[in-house]
Amino acid sequence: MPGVGFTEIHAENYMMAGGPALRFLDVVAERYPLSLHGVALSLGGEDPLDLDHLGRLKKLIDRFHPVSFSEHLAWSSHKGIFYNDLLPVVYDTATLTRVANHIATTQEILGMRLLLENPSTYVTFASSDWDEVDFLKETALRTGCGLLLDVNNVAVSAHNHGYSPADYIARFPHHLVGEIHIAGHDEQPEAVGSTVWIDGHGSPVSESVWNLLDQAIAMGGPRPVLLERDNAVPALEDLLPDLQRIAAALDAAEVDHAVAG
């Protein structure tokens, strides 16, 4: 399909022994580079890593040889109970040590570098003593992992917590970025005159997110950019204009960086 540079799947949707889903994925992987995106490792959780889950993930990686694997800075399991969500972590030294240890173990078992994604958040913790960007930088420094810059997550969190998304992008360590995500978000009314933004992946990408993508590419150079659409998915033909817009932004950055070099 013209305009499709690579595809990405949620790894947990394909952790079965066989069946049509894996056969279809074999066909996709023959045509396009494949990226795996995890949603359940619970890297920020206090529980030990689920080694059975990691084993299934390793089998998937060995079968499809993805160009990258990414996971979220979040937790989803506690005391053996799995919560079907990506929940926020406290940015303190204890969490940093725990996340770094979990990433190191994950990378050793999988035999590949992990890309850690900045989260979308809806609450903050008074006890946090690290800034999010600095926390991500330090985690990468300690583990050798890369980063996945989710531009929509930046926009969502910045709106919800009242800071500048452009300043966040400006401070981000772009040399560590292996992939960029963009997506749509939902705006839900809360108190009178206020809204909370939700990382919904079921609506078109907003102009504010497109502008942040342009900023990120200008600062860090071309990177693989994924258009995420998990809900209310339209026909592929309806998404092609967005893919063309991504390609144009990457092409312009190639020229700009060639001139600067």
PLM segments and residue spans:
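Acidic (Asp/Glu)-rich catalytic clusters
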Residues: 1-2, 18-36, 52-67, 105-109, ...
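Flexible glycine/acidic-rich beta-alpha junction loops that bind and position SAM and/or redox cofactors
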Residues: 75-81, 124, 152-159, 181-200, ...
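C-terminal helical cap(s) of enzyme catalytic domains, especially alpha/beta-barrels
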Residues: 236-258
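Conserved, mostly hydrophobic/aromatic
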Residues: 7, 69, 114, 150, ...
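Gly/Pro-rich active-site loop or hairpin
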Residues: 18, 48, 86-90, 96, ...
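N-terminal ordered "arm"
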Residues: 1-15
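Active-site acidic/histidine proton-transfer and metal-coordination neighborhood
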Residues: 50-147
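Acidic-and-aromatic substrate-binding clefts and catalytic sites of carbohydrate-active enzymes
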Residues: 11-23, 42-52, 122-129, 155-162, ...
